[in-house]
């Protein structure tokens, strides 16, 4: 019988864990979790997995209640920590990750058995997850990538030196909280922001330090609805913008690629609140609301509120709105 038959006969485990393991062996996944509850994965050193250092899979059911803490994961072929499926009540705390070559250093995803689903058909997904105190660096994708997660609380992490974005809240992320993080030197490929919300609603981005990323600090793209961007400091996010404009905060109704039309839409980024952020250093704009993209499966951005932000006096326009639809832009402050 194959290994799959063995898995199918397993009784789900509870109150179990892995501690103080050190391995450089190129396993597919160094640690696998299949439908186990009340788990502890702590103080392990996991190097050279061909896929993930720690994989929490939905293949045989969901995991509820778990702590992934104090692990060091280097040089893996995919995501260092992968949470795929309808898992909940997880704490991902104080891990050090470098050199992940997949989607992200930490990936939290609603993909069902690895397959993408439409955002308006999502009825389950990873939720009630805390991601705090982690240091993620040198990844080939994003440092942190969320797909269709909700009620995920991402705080006090350092996300740096990734080829793509520092963090992406993507494809139906709802009601997540991203606060007090340091997001630095991401988007090495060029033309990418430090923080991206792509098809996400009701997320809060609060009090982050976003600097030295490759194009913009914080970007809402395609459909971003009712998000709150508040109290962030965005500095010098234009070092490798590759001809694109750069702004501290960028609101874009970008077109949806043909291959993604079955999964996401390009309605536009509407009803977002951008409040009390500080934007200085190398950008073209403090806040930029882009023109419409209705001809290319995109949309228009409207009814956003841009207020009480502080912008460098070096910008020709602290806040610029090129959309055909109306937004509120007032009471912003130019710094000396």
Please give the residue ranges for each predicted region.
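Short, small-residue-biased leader/transition segments that mark boundaries at the very start
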Residues: 1-7
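Solenoidal tandem-repeat scaffolds enriched in leucines and small polar residues
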Residues: 53-68, 74-89, 96-128
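Intrinsically disordered, low-complexity Ser/Thr- and acidic-rich flexible linkers and loops
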Residues: 59-61, 110-125, 189-190, 240-244, ...
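Leucine-rich solenoid repeat scaffolds
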Residues: 296-336
């Amino acid at each position: 019988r194959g290994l799959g038959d063995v898995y199918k006969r397993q009784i789900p485990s509870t109150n179990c864990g892995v501690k103080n393991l050190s391995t450089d062996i190129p396993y597919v996944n160094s640690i696998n979790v299949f439908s186990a509850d009340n788990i502890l994965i702590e103080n392990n050193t996991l190097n050279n997995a061909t896929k993930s250092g720690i994989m929490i899979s939905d293949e045989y059911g969901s995991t509820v209640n778990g702590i992934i803490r104090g692990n060091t994961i280097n040089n893996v072929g995919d995501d260092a920590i992968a949470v795929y499926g309808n898992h909940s009540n997880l704490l991902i705390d104080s891990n050090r990750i470098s050199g992940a070559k997949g989607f992200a250093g930490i990936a939290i995803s609603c993909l069902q058995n690895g397959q993408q689903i439409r955002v308006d058909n999502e009825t389950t997904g990873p939720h009630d997850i805390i991601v705090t105190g982690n240091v993620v660096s040198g990844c080939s994708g994003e440092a942190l990538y969320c797909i269709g997660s909700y009620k995920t609380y991402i705080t006090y992490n350092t996300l740096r030196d990734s080829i793509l974005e520092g963090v992406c809240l993507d494809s139906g992320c709802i009601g997540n909280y991203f606060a007090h993080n340091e997001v630095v030197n991401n988007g090495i490929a060029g033309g990418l922001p430090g923080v991206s919300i792509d098809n996400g609603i009701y997320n809060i981005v609060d009090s982050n330090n976003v600097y030295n990323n490759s194009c913009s600090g914080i970007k809402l793209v395609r459909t971003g609805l009712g998000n709150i961007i508040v109290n962030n400091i965005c500095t010098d996010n234009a070092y490798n913008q590759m001809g694109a404009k750069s702004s501290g905060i960028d609101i874009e109704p970008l077109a949806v690629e043909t291959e993604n039309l079955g999964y996401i839409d390009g309605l536009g980024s509407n009803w977002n609140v951008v409040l009390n952020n500080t934007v200085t250093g190398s950008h073209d704009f403090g806040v930029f609301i882009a023109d419409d993209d209705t001809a290319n499966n995109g949309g228009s951005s409207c009814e956003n509120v841009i207020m009480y932000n502080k912008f460098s006096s070096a910008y020709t326009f602290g806040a610029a709105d090129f959309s055909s639809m109306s937004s509120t832009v007032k009471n912003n402050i130019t710094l000396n």
